[in-house]
Curated annotation (Swiss-Prot):
Organism: Drosophila melanogaster
Name of the protein: Mitochondrial pyruvate carrier 1
Subcellular location, record wording: Mitochondrion inner membrane
Broad class of the protein's primary localization: mitochondrion
Cell membrane found in the keyword field: no
Family assignment from sequence similarity: Belongs to the mitochondrial pyruvate carrier (MPC) (TC 2.A.105) family.
Gene: Mpc1
Function field: Mediates the uptake of pyruvate into mitochondria.
Keyword S-adenosyl-L-methionine on entry: no
Length: 107
């Protein structure tokens, strides 16, 4: 019975309209940035660009606000940018520690 209800829900116009809208496909396409940032946390910090990390952090913070303010609220986009802001902040801390940390720890 629940399968039948799920099928009727997914066949509804509202459901199709959501999955064919930019409110869905925009965040889906955008998830590549935080996934790449999370994957890069396993790589050496000598390859981190401080300027790009800062730019991506600010970009995600700005668009988190946009995703919250737009009506209807785009929680999928908000989650994407929150994840990216967190991942980029981690990368930024790794960059700072590697480039400006104490020289004794780097040796």
């Amino acid at each position: 019975m629940s399968i039948r209800r799920a099928m009727s829900t997914t066949a509804s116009k509202e459901w199709r309209d959501y999955f064919m809208s930019t409110h869905f496909w925009g965040p889906v396409a955008n998830w590549g940035i935080p996934v790449a940032a999370l994957a890069d946390t396993q790589k050496s910090p000598k390859f981190i660009s401080g300027k790009m990390t800062l730019a991506l952090t600010l970009y995600s913070c700005i668009f988190m606000r946009f995703a919250y303010k737009v009506q209807p609220r785009n929680w999928l986009l908000f989650a994407c940018h929150a994840t990216n802001a967190t991942a980029q902040s981690i990368q930024g801390l790794r960059f700072l520690h590697y480039n400006y940390g104490s020289k004794e720890q780097q040796a």
